[in-house]
């Protein structure tokens, strides 16, 4: 895990950063439905898991722009940008109705990511611990699949004043609408390092990456 320190005075969002870390600490979140029809069909055609395919594309999108890889070292009050960020996914245990966090390293190579993500999930199924280790995994973002509901809105709250810059992404069950499969995706980012454009851009990039991925013959 490596990062670079960002000069807050030279940071291109310095004014916004100052306002939303000193005067009005808050986050910004959005829920929108995206068309996953082609990605679902691709997953079925290649006999791969839709969930892992989506997680890969989400991780690729968030690693494509520095704005989504920001962090804050509260001990030294330094703004930083990680070289890469990795998803924390979750395994749900039906018998106990609890979740276990799963750390999965992001690899740009799809096959390597897919293989490791599947292995990580299988390993997590053997434990019942909620073993988040944020001290040793600071460059990780939350990626949670809410498989029981195709919801319309979701908001994740954090304590006032807590400068949590890692993206928090949730998505729900897809459902058919007018012949297409639509899936709700919620994006939460700290307002100090992201605005409406950057939140909306996650959806735009996801749609682009899904289109390219679904057209290729990889993954099977």
Can you say where each PLM-predicted feature lies in the sequence?
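Gly/Ser/Thr-rich phosphate-binding loops and adjoining beta-strand/alpha-helix segments
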Residues: 3-6, 21-53, 69-85, 140-143, ...
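Hydrophobic/aromatic-rich structural module bridging two neighboring secondary-structure elements via a short loop
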Residues: 63-103
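Glycine-rich active-site loop/lid that clamps phosphate-bearing ligands
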Residues: 146-168
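Acyl activation and transfer enzymes in specialized metabolism, enriched
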Residues: 39-64, 183-202
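Short amphipathic alpha-helices and their capping loops
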Residues: 1-23, 83-92, 156
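Acyl-group handling in specialized metabolite and lipid biosynthesis
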Residues: 28-32, 39-46, 97-111, 194
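Histidine-centered acyl-transfer/condensation active-site motif
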Residues: 135-148, 167-204
């Amino acid at each position: 895990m490596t990062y670079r320190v960002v000069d807050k005075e030279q940071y291109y969002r310095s004014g916004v950063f100052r306002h939303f870390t000193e005067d009005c600490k808050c986050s910004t979140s959005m829920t929108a439905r995206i068309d996953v029809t082609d990605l679902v069909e691709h997953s079925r055609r290649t006999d791969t898991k839709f969930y892992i395919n989506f997680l890969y594309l989400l991780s690729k999108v968030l690693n494509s722009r520095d704005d989504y890889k920001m962090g804050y070292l509260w001990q030294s009050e330094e703004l930083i940008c990680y070289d890469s960020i990795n998803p924390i996914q979750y395994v749900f245990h039906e018998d106990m109705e609890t979740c276990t966090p799963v750390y999965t390293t992001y690899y740009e190579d799809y096959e390597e990511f897919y293989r490791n993500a599947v292995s990580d999930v299988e390993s997590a199924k053997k434990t019942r611990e909620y073993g988040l280790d944020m001290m040793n995994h600071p460059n990780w973002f939350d990626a949670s699949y809410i498989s029981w509901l195709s919801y319309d809105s979701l908001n994740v709250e954090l304590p006032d004043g807590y400068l949590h810059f890692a993206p928090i992404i949730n998505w729900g069950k897809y459902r058919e609408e007018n012949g297409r499969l639509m899936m709700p995706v919620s994006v939460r980012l700290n307002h100090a390092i992201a605005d409406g454009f950057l939140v909306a851009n996650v959806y735009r990039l996801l749609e682009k990456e899904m289109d390219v991925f679904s057209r290729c013959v990889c993954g099977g």
